[in-house]
Amino acid sequence: MSLSDIQQAILSLITNNINADGVSPSQTEIARAFGFKGVRAVQHHLDVLEQQGMIRRIPGQARGIRLKHLTEVDEVALALQSKDVLRLPVLGRVAAGQPIGADIGEDHVVLLDRVFFSPAPDYLLRVQGDSMRDEGIFDGDLIGVHRTQDAHSGQIVVARIDDEITVKLLKISKDRIRLLPRNPDFAPIEVRSDQDFAIEGLYCGLLRPNR
């Protein structure tokens, strides 16, 4: 089956967008470009393009259209050119439970869409424990951390107590600082005056790897 003129034009739009920006257009952007009333028509044409071996789609990923003729190396190179793609190192573990010893050493680097985070993170940490369960942060998740020492009461932070790292809800009152879990099975951590305490960064979103 040959491609229609519209399907060839959609393929050209996808190719040009990937070459220029490193990412494919969204289905909404394709619909707008061709005057479709919604994305259903776009999905039909994308189905045909995929059946013809021109593209492949990554389920559940925004802008997840890929050109079949690109190699994995080509895709990574294009992604690194995009302003919407973050290249983030995984810098060890962070406790969502009792603080654990710092485990800071670059494990690997992942490429992620900026849309998953606000503000943009500087690095990722892998969560160990479930003390932040009620905030939707689970054991094994990768959390984005925006590196800063400025934080306000009520924000979720990555904090250092002496040589240990933890992720908790920050509560600051007139005479004390507490790090609160979001799971009733865990007790708050009271920061003592004789401890070396610092905010390492703000929690700004997460990635849940396939279990």
From Swiss-Prot:
UniProt entry tagged with the keyword DNA-binding: yes
EC code(s) of this entry: 3.4.21.88
Keywords on record: Autocatalytic cleavage, DNA damage, DNA repair, DNA replication, DNA-binding, Hydrolase, Repressor, SOS response, Transcription, Transcription regulation
Catalytic activity: Hydrolysis of Ala-|-Gly bond in repressor LexA
Name the record gives this protein: LexA repressor
Site (Cleavage): 96-97
SUPFAM superfamilies linked to this entry: LexA/Signal peptidase, Winged helix' DNA-binding domain
InterPro entries from the UniProt entry: LexA (IPR006200), LexA-like (IPR039418), LexA/Signal_pep-like_sf (IPR036286), LexA_DNA-bd_dom (IPR006199), LexA_repressor (IPR050077), Peptidase_S24_LexA (IPR006197), Peptidase_S24_S26A/B/C (IPR015927), WH-like_DNA-bd_sf (IPR036388)
GO biological process, alphabetically ordered: DNA repair; DNA replication; negative regulation of DNA-templated transcription; proteolysis; SOS response
Assembly: Homodimer.
Domain of life of the native organism: Bacteria
Any Pfam family hit: Peptidase_S24
DNA-binding region: 27-47
Catalytic center residues: 131, 168
Enzyme kind, highest EC tier: hydrolase
Similarity-based family: Belongs to the peptidase S24 family.
Role: Represses a number of genes involved in the response to DNA damage (SOS response), including recA and lexA. In the presence of single-stranded DNA, RecA interacts with LexA causing an autocatalytic cleavage which disrupts the DNA-binding part of LexA, leading to derepression of the SOS regulon and eventually DNA repair.
HAMAP family, sorted: LexA
Protein source organism: Xylella fastidiosa (strain Temecula1 / ATCC 700964)
GO molecular-function term, one example from the UniProt record: serine-type endopeptidase activity
Gene name linked to the record: lexA
